[in-house]
Regions:
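Flavin-dependent oxidoreductase catalytic cores
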Residues: 1-125
Length: 125
């Protein structure tokens, strides 16, 4: 369950300054609304960069799946770091859209401002 404005690519993937995208789990309120009408499993998305918060939402049953895109670009080893007890080392997406959306718009591929840090860490988990 998500929110998007497809009038322009820049509006499809909202930056941190977007009025609906200010808090962690910002779109989960839409899951809450959908839940009123169905009991099917719901996948939440939107600013899910805090592993403790994500775990709380899953454990409470608010969502049954957590979807992440930019967060996994920011740190492809997010799950591995959690499993190895290194959650504090996770590079959290800052929703700047500089290289992820910016790369798409410039036809340069999908990247992240953390790419250099991730490359340096590769294999060190």
């Amino acid at each position: 369950v998500t929110l998007a404005n497809h009038s322009a690519l820049e509006n499809t993937i909202p930056p941190a300054s977007h009025p609906e995208f200010k808090e962690t789990g910002c779109f989960l309120k839409f899951c809450d609304e959908v839940r009123r009408y169905t009991s099917v499993p719901l996948c939440g998305v939107g600013g899910l960069n805090d592993p403790d918060f994500v775990e709380q939402q899953l454990a409470s049953g608010r969502i049954q799946c957590a979807a992440m895109c930019r967060q996994l670009l920011a740190d492809p080893n997010w799950v591995n770091k959690l499993q190895s007890g290194n959650a504090a080392k996770i590079h959290r997406c800052v929703r700047c859209n500089k290289k992820c959306l910016g790369g798409l718009i410039a036809h340069q591929g999908t990247r992240c401002v953390y790419d250099a840090l991730n490359a340096k860490e590769q294999g060190s988990i």
